[in-house]
Amino acid sequence: MDKNNCINRRKFLQMTGAAAAGTTAAMIGCSPHKDGSGALGPVPTDMMTFRTFPSLGDKVSLLGYGCMRWPTMPNPEGQGMIVNQEVVNELVDYAIAHGVNFFDTSPGYVMGQSERATGIALKRHPREKFFIATKMSNFSNFTYEASLAMYRNSFVQLQVDYIDYYFLHMLGTIGQRGLEGRFLDNGILDFLLKEREEGRIRHLGWSFHGTLEGFQQALALHDEIHWDFVMIQMNYSDWKNAAAGRNVNADYLYEELTKRNIPVLIMEPLLGGRLANLPTHIVSRLKEQNPDGSVASWAFRFAGSFDNILTVLSGMTQLEHLQDNIRTYSPLLPLNEEQKDFLYMTAELMLQYPTIPCNDCMYCMPCPYGIDIPGILLHYNKCINDGMLPRSRNDENYRKTRRAFLVSYDRTVEKIRQANHCTGCKQCNITCPQRIDIPTQLRRLHNFVEQLRQDTLDG
């Protein structure tokens, strides 16, 4: 690395105002804070950055549409929520009109409704205008028959006769719930390889969540199988600090794939939104560095600044998020080394905030006991980032922060869905890609809330 492009820690602290990290925010309450992502002018329609790899032959938009967070609405014909198909159609139309051509879904996304909604929206466009990616998400029943049925149903739901990018979903666990049990022992991987030979799968790869051993196990098959791509969680926080959250650092994953010439797809460039909802003093300093860019744009520019990245997926529920990301990649302005170093040090500073690494992926849902797991964890994280977590009773603002935390908790999460209803069944732990011990965290948060409520009664 060019020493002239490096910034030392003292300069970084001056840039971020880290000395203010421990101070109490001026506003009481755990409401979202402003991130500067308002109207930023026109959205380019013909300036999208594309990536092409000889091994794939596809011209893919650097911004990919993650279909895990399609907007929903109450079911007018019954209970629960359904995908708002009209809004999905509008988002897909807008994305394609502005150069986005990669759409990533799964049989399990959005309560099992994502593939169908994505298929309906894309069917209205010429097939050559888009690339579709979906997954074998055979987590609970991974017999050959069940896996085959899931695969064939994806074609029906998506209304296609070939799939551009097909994933072995969420590899990384050693044993029966990993590569061996879900894909090797049952023979389904052999079937998928034949499907690739016959063209119904154009490219075959996998997404990674898990341990170093799990990653190396899947990668070791490359010489025999020739993986066409791999998707990893990569952002400036996980680049060197993922191991702090029981995951594998993204710099290692990226380099191992790159030296084997395996194209990389990125998921969680925003860490489930956490890198767009940073502590207030970090937000202000990022805005000082780039007043016209959103906080999220820093994370997307980082993700796109590496040559071996095919596409960066973002689950864009709202039009303004889609517009912001299109601006960032139309065209991409890559980060220089000094800017990357600034973000690496920002990530180190973020470690001072004891947040729970929930990315709101919803893999833990639905809870069999109705608990709103992501809602509880994200509320806690928001209060930490806003400096509104009640701490010592001796703090001057303790009563105000205590009241604000409890009021916002009850408003954010229905009482019947709060942490005290957790039975510790650990079903959620099996599917959490961040490897969070969810029952332990829920028990800890419940005890914390009960202590605050008891303090209220005690005066």
What residue spans do the PLM features occupy?
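N-terminal binding-site loop/beta-alpha segment at the start of enzyme catalytic domains
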Residues: 2-130, 161, 191, 197
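Structured C-terminal cap/extension of enzyme domains
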Residues: 27, 226, 252-459
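Conserved, mostly hydrophobic/aromatic
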Residues: 53, 65, 103, 118, ...
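Hydrophobic faces of well-ordered beta-strands that scaffold small-molecule active sites
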Residues: 61-65, 103-105, 132-134, 166-168, ...
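Residues that line or immediately flank small-molecule/substrate-binding pockets and catalytic motifs
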Residues: 67, 107-110, 167-170, 208, ...
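Active-site mouth loops of central-metabolism enzymes
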Residues: 71-85, 136-144, 286-289
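Glycine/proline-rich, positively charged
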Residues: 74, 141-265, 270, 278-282, ...
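Structural motif corresponding to the early beta-alpha repeats
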Residues: 109, 125-144, 148, 169-172
